[in-house]
Amino acid sequence: ATFDVVNQCTFTVWAGASPGGGKQLDQGQTWTITVAPGSTKARIWGRTGCNFDANGQGKCQTGDCNGLLQCQGYGSPPNTLAEFSLNQPNNLDYVDISLVDGFNIPMDFSPAAAGVCKDIRCATDITAQCPAELQAPGGCNNPCTVYKTNEYCCTNGQGTCGPTALSKFFKDRCPDAYSYPQDDPTSLFTCPAGTNYKVVFCPNLDA
């Protein structure tokens, strides 16, 4: 499957992808990634406030992946995530936007061909409204990152946690996105296997 990663932000975003690596995207630029069929627990995110040297080493304010331009693993919270597992049983792809690792950039995650399946959006500037206890440089932390308790992180397994006032802060602003780890019923979507996708940083914001 191909993923077109598009930066519509007025600022530079350093895209990260696992699998895929990373790339600097100035406003209006696109990075096309080819992801192998059957890839699971894959994700794409944006990094902000980065400085890299000629060897691709440095640091980002949000989404940093061990100081590397070419990510080899996941990024550090807070970062808005497009997550996907491809070619799963019944010829389905599973796709979602997750705020379980917090929020740094508004995002739209959609099939490249409109209408094939759900256009998943988190197009609100959550950082600007972030509760004081969740504020982080350049973003807004999920309460799981801050408090690391089962109440917020669901570490004790299925059915041991539910929505909280702090998870609802995210859900109210981005109803399509995971606000806590067991938010599956309203946040996990399927597309036909073989679908190609588009991930947009800073889509036109919802009012």
From Swiss-Prot:
Pfam families: Thaumatin (PF00314). It is found in: Secreted. One of its GO terms (cellular component) is extracellular region. Disulfide bonds join C9-C202, C50-C60, C65-C71, C117-C191, C122-C174, C130-C140, C144-C153, C154-C161. GO terms for biological process: defense response. Not glycosylated. It comes from the Eukaryota. Its main location: secreted. Its EC number is 3.2.1.-. GO terms for molecular function: hydrolase activity, acting on glycosyl bonds. Keywords: Allergen, Disulfide bond, Glycosidase, Hydrolase, Pathogenesis-related protein, Plant defense, Secreted. On the 2D-gel the determined pI of this protein is: 4.4. Monomer. Acidic thaumatin-like protein. Exhibits weak beta-1,3-glucanase activity with laminarin as substrate. Belongs to the thaumatin family. This is Thaumatin-like protein 1. It comes from Manilkara zapota (Sapodilla plum). The gene is TLP1.
